[in-house]
Swiss-Prot record:
Organism: Shigella flexneri
Gene Ontology BP, a term: protein targeting
Family designation: Belongs to the FliR/MopE/SpaR family.
Gene name for this UniProt entry: spaR
Regions that span the bilayer: 13-33, 37-57, 79-99, 129-149, 183-203, 217-237
Membrane topology: Multi-pass membrane protein
Keyword Transferase: no
Predominant location category: membrane
One GO CC term, this protein: plasma membrane
Keywords, alphabetical: Cell membrane, Membrane, Plasmid, Transmembrane, Transmembrane helix, Virulence
Cell compartment(s), UniProt: Cell membrane
Protein's name in the database: Surface presentation of antigens protein SpaR
The keyword Cell membrane belongs to this UniProt entry's keyword annotation: yes
């Protein structure tokens, strides 16, 4: 092998490495256990390149002259695919984050909101707990293998440096699924808190000397924790595992 072909092979390898990097990078920014709050940028970027180097040979890639002519457009396409894939993989974490926010809003504990280091947003304490809970169940149930399978599936649907179309119109379906699942999972606690509000209202009507507002937060918090304790080992745990088997649906929701 002469020097020119050696440099050409290095050039091709770097192009492939950057193409895979642009698809993987959004995953490390959106997933709660891989973003800035958990892994520092000085460590995360080399890890992305290391994972990308292992995925280069996952499929056959034809690099022709058109790739070099439209390299910026193709890199932008890889970023879009990575973003859509990140949205699909982050869906269970966003759902449980919304569940915690809804429950804290209903029990009147949003005053304790603080900056969540895993998401970088102002969030309630229960939302952070549910986010970490979903991440633990996700990883315990083989989440990293699921992520690699989803990446592999994305390359089968939309190969590297090839043309593919996006069904961006289905973003409304994605948002509907996010909101509906959050309300469904939070509904047991919401129903119990609504009944407690009715009982506290009756109590304040017949015993006005007892300030129902001063004890409402304590009572509703105890009831919410009790219902969460019952649902966490059944409904919530199985719901996270349900999303682990739906990578084909979520990936095909956007890319064809």
């Amino acid at each position: 092998m002469d020097i020119s072909s050696w440099f050409e092979s290095i050039h091709v390898f770097l192009i492939l490495l950057n193409g895979v990097f642009f698809r993987l990078a959004p995953l490390f920014f959106f997933l709660p256990f891989l973003n800035n709050g958990i892994i520092s940028p000085s460590i995360r970027i080399p890890v992305i390149f290391l994972v990308a180097s292992g995925l280069i040979t996952s499929g056959k890639v034809d690099i022709g002259s058109s790739v070099f002519e439209h390299v910026y457009f193709l890199m932008f396409k890889e970023i879009i695919v990575g973003l859509l894939l990140s949205f699909c993989l982050s869906l269970p974490f966003w759902i449980f984050h919304a569940v915690g926010s809804i429950i804290d809003n209903q029990r009147g504990a949003t005053l304790s909101s603080s900056i969540d280091p895993a998401n970088g947003v102002d969030t309630s304490e229960l939302a952070k707990f549910f986010n970490l809970f979903s991440a633990v169940v996700f990883l315990y149930s083989g989440g990293m293998v699921f992520i690699l399978e989803s990446i592999q599936l994305s390359y089968n649907i939309c190969p590297l440096f090839s043309q593919c179309s996006f069904r961006i119109s289905n973003i409304l379906t994605f948002l509907t699924l996010l909101a509906s699942q959050a309300v469904i999972l939070a509904s047991p606690v919401m129903i119990v808190l609504l009944l407690s509000e009715v009982l506290l209202g009756v109590l304040s009507r017949f015993a006005p000397q007892m300030n129902a507002f001063s004890v409402s937060l304590t009572i509703k918090s105890l009831l919410a924790i009790f219902i969460i304790f019952i649902c966490s080992s059944t409904i919530y745990f199985s719901k996270v595992q349900f999303f682990l088997g739906e990578h084909k649906f979520f990936t095909n929701l956007f890319v064809r």
